[in-house]
């Protein structure tokens, strides 16, 4: 049986649960449930604090976990390996200071830095050869400067709205670029059970990023048309009742769909359709 950790709350929780449901897994029915067993797929899900997930996986108590890259780096150091990036929950981890003050990384030396990610900050300071006092807080880090607890902060930045509300501005290099990821124990062999779950979720991600393009095309323009729609390996080309025309089908990036349809139309293709892909299994 596979044992998988899922965030029980926070920005990653709802999307992670939704992706697993789309991948065919039975999730908890009550938000208060701490575990859920999917008998059909022989997977038990554990709903845990996002910050604790990498710790459980690193120690071998759970096989896989969904968490943030920043959380994994802070809580488990080198104890877990990133197996799959999930493409949601994007953020950066930055130093920030009052926006009316001039700050750079050279000014951090000897200062007080408030953060909920002490290991991540300490590792960054050590890499830069900077000595500073790292103060661990469990939340509301942005208010610590106003309260006199810290000189600067290091925190997750998504939109920057919370920082601006507190009169703060990020500075210096990005410490960590984060998103939701699936982690496994460091150097743990990836078993067939692992692969099934990873491929299912990967299929959901591909379905969100791609769609299927269908169109009719004169044979004389086929070479040019298929340059626009090469597909994954090659497009599917089928004969039509009119021997001078063929039907073409190919996967294409969702973000390029409208421009691609415009170019196919200008080339001379007809009956151009774009349809969603619900789930996919790709070899590459």
UniProtKB/Swiss-Prot annotation:
This enzyme's EC code(s): 2.4.2.17
Biological pathway: Amino-acid biosynthesis; L-histidine biosynthesis; L-histidine from 5-phospho-alpha-D-ribose 1-diphosphate: step 1/9
A GO cellular component annotated for this chain's UniProt record is:
cytoplasm
Matching SUPFAM superfamilies, A to Z?
A: GlnB-like, Periplasmic binding protein-like II
Listed GO MF terms = ATP binding; ATP phosphoribosyltransferase activity; magnesium ion binding
UniProt entry keywords in alphabetical sequence: Amino-acid biosynthesis, ATP-binding, Cytoplasm, Glycosyltransferase, Histidine biosynthesis, Magnesium, Metal-binding, Nucleotide-binding, Transferase
Activity regulation (UniProt): Feedback inhibited by histidine.
The compartments listed are: Cytoplasm
Gene Ontology biological process: L-histidine biosynthetic process
As its record notes, the protein acts as a catalyst of: 1-(5-phospho-beta-D-ribosyl)-ATP + diphosphate = 5-phospho-alpha-D-ribose 1-diphosphate + ATP
Requisite cofactors: Mg(2+)
Return any one Pfam family short name. HisG_C
Q: Which residues form a coiled coil?
A: none
Q: Which PANTHER family match?
A: ATP PHOSPHORIBOSYLTRANSFERASE (PTHR21403:SF8), ATP PHOSPHORIBOSYLTRANSFERASE ATP-PRTASE (PTHR21403)
The record's annotation in NCBIfam families points to: hisG (TIGR00070), HisG_C-term (TIGR03455)
Report the sequence similarity comment from the record: Belongs to the ATP phosphoribosyltransferase family. Long subfamily.
Q: What does this protein do?
A: Catalyzes the condensation of ATP and 5-phosphoribose 1-diphosphate to form N'-(5'-phosphoribosyl)-ATP (PR-ATP). Has a crucial role in the pathway because the rate of histidine biosynthesis seems to be controlled primarily by regulation of HisG enzymatic activity.
- Name under which the protein is recorded: ATP phosphoribosyltransferase
What organism is recorded for this protein?
Corynebacterium kroppenstedtii (strain DSM 44385 / JCM 11950 / CIP 105744 / CCUG 35717)
């Amino acid at each position: 049986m596979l044992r998988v950790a899922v965030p029980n709350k926070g920005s990653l929780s709802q999307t992670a649960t939704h992706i697993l449901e789309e991948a065919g897994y039975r999730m908890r029915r009550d938000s208060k449930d701490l575990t859920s067993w999917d008998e059909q797929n022989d997977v038990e899900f554990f709903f845990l604090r996002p910050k604790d997930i990498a710790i459980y996986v690193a120690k071998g108590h759970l096989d896989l976990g969904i968490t943030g890259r920043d959380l994994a780096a802070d809580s488990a150091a080198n104890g877990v390996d990133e197996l799959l990036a999930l493409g949601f929950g994007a953020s950066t981890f930055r130093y920030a200071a009052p926006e009316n003050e001039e700050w750079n990384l050279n000014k951090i030396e000897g200062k007080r830095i408030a953060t909920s990610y002490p290991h991540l900050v300490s590792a960054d300071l050590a890499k830069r050869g900077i000595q500073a006092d790292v103060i661990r807080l469990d939340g509301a880090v942005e208010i610590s400067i106003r309260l006199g607890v810290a000189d600067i902060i290091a925190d997750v930045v998504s939109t920057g709205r919370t920082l601006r509300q507190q009169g703060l501005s990020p500075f210096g290099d990005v410490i960590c670029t984060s998103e939701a990821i699936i982690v496994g124990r460091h150097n743990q062999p990836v078993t067939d059970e692992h692969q099934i779950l990873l491929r299912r979720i990967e299929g959901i991600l591909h379905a969100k990023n791609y769609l299927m393009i269908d169109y009719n095309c004169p044979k004389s323009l086929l070479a040019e048309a298929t340059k626009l729609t090469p597909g994954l390996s090659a497009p599917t080309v089928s004969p039509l009742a009119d021997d001078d025309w063929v039907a073409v089908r190919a996967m294409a990036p969702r973000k390029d769909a409208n421009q691609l349809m415009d170019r196919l139309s200008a080339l001379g293709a007809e009956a151009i359709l774009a349809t969603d892909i619900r789930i996919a299994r790709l070899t590459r």
